[in-house]
Design a protein with these regions (language model features):
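S-adenosyl-L-methionine-dependent methyltransferase catalytic core, i.e., the SAM/SAH-binding region
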Residues: 1-309
Length: 309
C-alpha cells in the first residue's frame, strides 16, 4: 500500500513512511504516539487512517517543531523529550496506546539550520548541537570541559572515530591554548588529526558530539523501558534508527525485553526472562532505491518492529 502524502519537506522528509505505517498495524479508532514529531510527516499519515475516535500524541523537544503543529482535534503536541513518554501521556489521561513510532537522530531542519551547529558545513555557527535549547549542555562545553578519557569513549562509542584516543588527547591540550567556540575553529584546530576522508571523519566526530550533547542513547533506553507498560496487547512499536549502536539497543530490547542478552541469574543457576514482545522484523527494513533517490539522507536508516504479547 502507498501511504505517501504531503508533509513538510522543508523541515524534514519522513523516512520509510509506508513501511512505518504498515508496521504500526493502524486501527481506525486507535491511540498512537509519534515520539519524534518534527515536520509532522508521520503524524499526518497516521491521522489519515484514523476515524474521529482515533488520537495521535506527538512528542518533540525542539521548540522549532511547534511551527508544524497539526490543526486537528485528534492531535496533541507534547513539547518534551520522548524519554518522558509515560509521564506526559498520563498527564493527558492516557495509560495505554495501540502503537508507538520513533524516528531517531537529527532532523533535516536541525541539520540544515546554520545557527544550530549540527552540520560540519555550518562553519560560522557556534558549537551548540542542542535539540532542546532549554538544556545547558552544548558541544562547546563538552569539548572544553570533558576529561581525556570521557572524550575518547565518546568519540569511539558514538562516532566510531578510528583515532579517538589521539583526538581526545589533542583536544585537551589544544583547548588550553584556545577554547573551542565555533565549528570552523574546531575543524581548523584538529585538521592535522584527520584520518581518511575529511568529510567522513568530521561527520563521525560531529555525530559523536551530537549524541553526547543530547544523551540520545540514554533517552532511547529510558523510553524503551516504559513501552511494555504503555502498549496494549497486540500493540506495535516501530523504531527507525540511523546509527549502529542505536540499532543494537533496539534489537536487544525487542528480543530480550532488556539491554543485555545474558540470562538473569538466581541462586540456583540461570534462567531466561520472558520478553514482553514478539519481534516482527527478524532483519531490519531498509529504504528502497526509489526512496534513496528521493531522499539520500535515508541511506543508513533501519526500521525494526515489535508487538506487545
Amino acid at each position: 500500500m502507498n501511504y505517501m502524502r504531503d508533509s513538510n519537506p522543508a523541515y524534514h522528509i519522513p523516512v520509510l513512511l509506508s513501511e512505518a505505517m504498515d508496521g504500526l498495524k493502524l486501527r481506525a479508532s486507535g491511540v498512537f504516539v509519534d515520539c519524534t514529531f518534527g515536520g509532522g510527516g508521520h503524524s499526518t499519515e497516521i491521522l489519515a487512517h484514523l476515524n474521529s475516535e482515533g488520537r495521535v500524541y506527538g512528542f518533540d523537544q525542539d521548540g522549532d517543531a511547534k511551527r508544524n503543529v497539526l490543526q486537528d482535534d485528534r492531535f496533541v503536541f507534547i513539547p518534551h523529550n520522548f524519554r518522558h513518554i509515560r509521564r506526559f501521556l498520563r498527564l493527558h489521561g492516557v495509560t495505554a496506546v495501540d502503537g508507538i513510532l520513533a524516528d531517531l537522530g537529527v532532523s533535516s531542519h536541525q541539520f540544515d539550520e546554520p545557527t544550530r551547529g549540527f552540520s560540519t558545513r555550518s562553519e560560522d555557527a557556534s558549537l551548540d548541537m542542542r535539540m532542546d535549547k532549554r538544556q545547558s549542555l552544548t558541544a562547546e562545553s563538552v569539548l572544553n570541559t570533558y576529561g581525556e578519557q570521557k572524550l575518547q569513549e565518546m568519540f569511539s562509542m558514538y562516532g566510531e572515530v578510528t583515532n579517538a584516543k589521539t583526538l581526545a588527547k589533542a583536544i585537551v591540550t589544544l583547548r588550553n591554548k584556545t577554547p573551542f567556540r565555533t565549528v570552523r575553529g574546531f575543524k581548523q584546530t584538529i585538521a592535522d588529526l584527520v584520518k581518511g576522508n575529511p568529510n567522513r571523519y568530521f561527520a563521525q566526530v560531529f555525530q559523536a558530539l551530537r549524541i553526547e550533547v543530547n544523551d540520545e542513547t540514554g533517552a532511547l533506553r529510558e523510553m524503551l523501558t516504559q513501552v511494555p507498560d504503555l502498549l496494549k496487547p497486540g500493540g506495535r512499536i516501530v523504531i527507525i534508527s540511523f546509527h549502529s549502536l542505536e540499532d543494537r539497543i533496539v534489537k536487544q530490547f525487542f528480543r530480550y525485553g532488556r539491554f543485555e542478552a545474558k540470562d538473569e541469574q538466581d541462586p540456583f543457576g540461570s534462567f531466561p526472562s520472558i520478553t514482553p514482545f514478539r519481534t516482527i522484523t527478524k532483519k531490519p527494513i531498509t529504504p528502497s532505491e526509489k526512496e534513496l533517490n528521493r531522499n539520500p539522507r535515508a541511506r543508513s536508516a533501519k526500521l525494526r518492529i515489535a508487538e506487545k504479547i
